[in-house]
């Protein structure tokens, strides 16, 4: 079968890889000059299934109001008056209750845990190297309230079967030695030992080369103008004067998927702007060992081979990719506070990207009402975490094979009135980990 994939970020490339392994004739189209040039280029580097959770959670609306007046707030909103933004924000607010949160989180954890297993299998099969580490993630708490809340909320992890350990401030240095010097600023941490880290861009570039060797064709520097429809299916992709035809099509355009699908399939995917700093390491002993997540500022600090990646924050500002100096100040403040001697901040590379977010936090993976059109988008801040699982899942669906995990509630059909997912036991009715 001929398959055209639109988008060469980590989600598009993993989709291409798994489809090619099934024997399909795969073509990937992207407007950039190579893979992983946009959202996948500078993310925080976390592969954190245990922390897979929607931004839409109980208490977030009130927190968002408070954050409006804080200099280093993790979330910022700038209204542009567009119907897309207002509608998406309203849908997100409707998901900010405990019942929706538990359903959405259970979906996200299911896919994220599966994705980590797929990545592990891919790594074993190919030997792909991407500065990956299997050292876990350590969530850091700065207040007693944060620590106490975590102690109450670990039932979420128990329910999902995710290993964890709750550490006191004195125990943090046993897993992150450089934190010994700043333990007095912290009240403890929650460690997930099975989480991983790695350079998403490097992974995507190298997997793209492997996919090309497996027969995948990449067409770069080519903008997609329109999807052509005949009856109940896609007839081709219009790229300038050319029409590229296939038997099946996959939209993996990230935050730009919504506009491409306008008038064909309605999806609630909106850009959530994030930032990162990439800092050269000057003293390995003073740098993080794996990944730490600052709960107060929602900032992740990740270790690559000879670099530190500091990433996070969320701005609801439309498709604006300009670099905001105030956001750099926040990233610098957090890394200086926790790892003051780990790297040379004066040589840091500042970056921003647009994460494709759904209002319920769950990505959209699967078929659409157009019988040969498939979606793999809306992964938000967890594209790297969920990429391999989403790619394998989509390949199974296109192949007509029953997926390894329940997937009906991951498709766009879940937004349809009257949708009834398969019966899956929900997570415990407790407060979310935030």
Curated annotation (Swiss-Prot):
Cofactor(s) required, per the database record: FAD
MF-aspect GO terms: D-amino-acid dehydrogenase activity
Keyword Oxidoreductase attached: yes
Domain of life: Bacteria
Pfam families the record matches: DAO (PF01266)
Binding site for FAD: 3-17
Major enzyme class: oxidoreductase
Keywords for this protein: FAD, Flavoprotein, Oxidoreductase
Keyword field contains ATP-binding: no
Catalytic reaction(s) noted: a D-alpha-amino acid + A + H2O = a 2-oxocarboxylate + AH2 + NH4(+)
Pathway where it operates: Amino-acid degradation; D-alanine degradation; NH(3) and pyruvate from D-alanine: step 1/1
GO biological process per UniProt: D-alanine catabolic process
One GO CC annotation: plasma membrane
EC nos: 1.4.99.-
PANTHER family given in the database record: D-AMINO ACID DEHYDROGENASE, SARCOSINE DEHYDROGENASE-RELATED
Cited function: Oxidative deamination of D-amino acids.
Record-stated family: Belongs to the DadA oxidoreductase family.
Protein name: D-amino acid dehydrogenase
Native organism: Yersinia pestis (strain Pestoides F)
